[in-house]
Amino acid sequence: MAKIISAFIDESGDFGFTGEASKYYLITFVFHDQSIDISKNINKIKDKPVFHAGPIIRREYPFVNVSAEERKKLFQSIFMFTQLLPINSKTFSYNKKEYNEDLLKLKARMTRDIYNFFNDNRELFSDAKLLVYYDNGQHLITNIINSALAITGLDYEFKQKVHPENYRLFQVADFINCWK
């Protein structure tokens, strides 16, 4: 049976260029070889709440009444969890002002960077099936990732109906994005 590699993807930012639009756009991939069992790692944090950096930092639901000390502990626990996992990650970072409000240039650069990453690391992925876990938070990102992977010739599949609360590695991608 072919090796299966999971790719959990989280993004941070938006595609706007004016007003209150974000200055940066980040896309983080977290890779896990499914032949390596991480159930013991996951069991250690099974009683922890779902990690989502934005609501924890901004004290949004469900963290409205959670003290700063408790929220700090959540970050510490996801940090330790992440450090002990047999995973690899890659974050792509874009300073949007470098694209002079040209969304097409930004999309082209993202597609090219993701394609180049997979092509440059072909030996890691060529004998594997890549299962892509993305919640379709931004449809443009789904299209960019699909376009980049399609031209690599790698065997990949997008998992359907992905919800971050169901996957701790998706939450790790969110944490890494926040940390970067």
Tell what function each PLM region has:
Residues 1-180:
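Phosphate-ester processing/binding pockets and catalytic centers
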